[in-house]
Amino acid sequence: MRTLWIMAVLLLGVEGHLLQLRKMIKKMTNKEPILSYGKYGCNCGMAGRGQPVDGTDRCCSIHNCCYGKVNGCSPKWDYYTYSEENGDIVCEEKHPCKDVCECDKAVATCFRDNLDTYKKRNIFHPKSSCVKVSTPC
């Protein structure tokens, strides 16, 4: 069980309440987020930064930048409120952590829209081979 929690923390460098983000990604992609995206490419996972290796990795880069713009909430730990309407994720308009929800919704949607770029060989892409980007956001 402890190993699963550690893996959950690795997810996307994850931030966004972990269970809520996991649920969104699972809904949009039908993939197990921790195993599928936790160490994907150069930008998914802890301390991820660099030139994206593909569209899926670009989703993580955008997500990292999105979290960098969040104010007033701790993306890793603060809950937010959302609902599902007609298959879409709708973040509660007046919730103080709505911005975190929108970041998580965007990455889940991006993963779904980039399923055709997802490659198993990038799951454990060596971060040492990632090219730094001067202005990642």
UniProtKB/Swiss-Prot annotation:
<dbReference type="GO" id="GO:0005576">
    <property type="term" value="C:extracellular region"/>
</dbReference>
<dbReference type="InterPro" id="IPR036444">
    <property type="entry name" value="PLipase_A2_dom_sf"/>
</dbReference>
<dbReference type="InterPro" id="IPR016090">
    <property type="entry name" value="PLipase_A2_dom"/>
</dbReference>
<dbReference type="GO" id="GO:0016042">
    <property type="term" value="P:lipid catabolic process"/>
</dbReference>
<feature type="disulfide bond">
    <location>
        <begin position="66"/>
        <end position="103"/>
    </location>
</feature>
<feature type="disulfide bond">
    <location>
        <begin position="59"/>
        <end position="110"/>
    </location>
</feature>
<feature type="disulfide bond">
    <location>
        <begin position="44"/>
        <end position="60"/>
    </location>
</feature>
<feature type="signal peptide">
    <location>
        <begin position="1"/>
        <end position="16"/>
    </location>
</feature>
<comment type="similarity">
    <text>Belongs to the phospholipase A2 family. Group II subfamily. N49 sub-subfamily.</text>
</comment>
<keyword id="KW-0959">Myotoxin</keyword>
<keyword id="KW-0800">Toxin</keyword>
<dbReference type="InterPro" id="IPR033113">
    <property type="entry name" value="PLipase_A2_His_AS"/>
</dbReference>
<dbReference type="GO" id="GO:0006644">
    <property type="term" value="P:phospholipid metabolic process"/>
</dbReference>
<dbReference type="GO" id="GO:0090729">
    <property type="term" value="F:toxin activity"/>
</dbReference>
<dbReference type="InterPro" id="IPR001211">
    <property type="entry name" value="PLipase_A2"/>
</dbReference>
<feature type="disulfide bond">
    <location>
        <begin position="65"/>
        <end position="137"/>
    </location>
</feature>
<feature type="disulfide bond">
    <location>
        <begin position="91"/>
        <end position="101"/>
    </location>
</feature>
<keyword id="KW-1203">Blood coagulation cascade inhibiting toxin</keyword>
<dbReference type="GO" id="GO:0005543">
    <property type="term" value="F:phospholipid binding"/>
</dbReference>
<dbReference type="InterPro" id="IPR033112">
    <property type="entry name" value="PLipase_A2_Asp_AS"/>
</dbReference>
<dbReference type="GO" id="GO:0005509">
    <property type="term" value="F:calcium ion binding"/>
</dbReference>
<feature type="disulfide bond">
    <location>
        <begin position="42"/>
        <end position="130"/>
    </location>
</feature>
<keyword id="KW-0964">Secreted</keyword>
<feature type="disulfide bond">
    <location>
        <begin position="73"/>
        <end position="97"/>
    </location>
</feature>
<dbReference type="GO" id="GO:0042130">
    <property type="term" value="P:negative regulation of T cell proliferation"/>
</dbReference>
<keyword id="KW-1199">Hemostasis impairing toxin</keyword>
<keyword id="KW-0732">Signal</keyword>
<dbReference type="Pfam" id="PF00068">
    <property type="entry name" value="Phospholip_A2_1"/>
</dbReference>
<dbReference type="GO" id="GO:0047498">
    <property type="term" value="F:calcium-dependent phospholipase A2 activity"/>
</dbReference>
<comment type="function">
    <text>Snake venom phospholipase A2 homolog that induces local edema a few hours after injection (5-10 ug) in the hind paw and shows weak anticoagulant and myotoxic activities.</text>
</comment>
<protein>
    <recommendedName>
        <fullName>Basic phospholipase A2 homolog Ts-R6</fullName>
    </recommendedName>
</protein>
<keyword id="KW-1015">Disulfide bond</keyword>
<dbReference type="GO" id="GO:0050482">
    <property type="term" value="P:arachidonate secretion"/>
</dbReference>
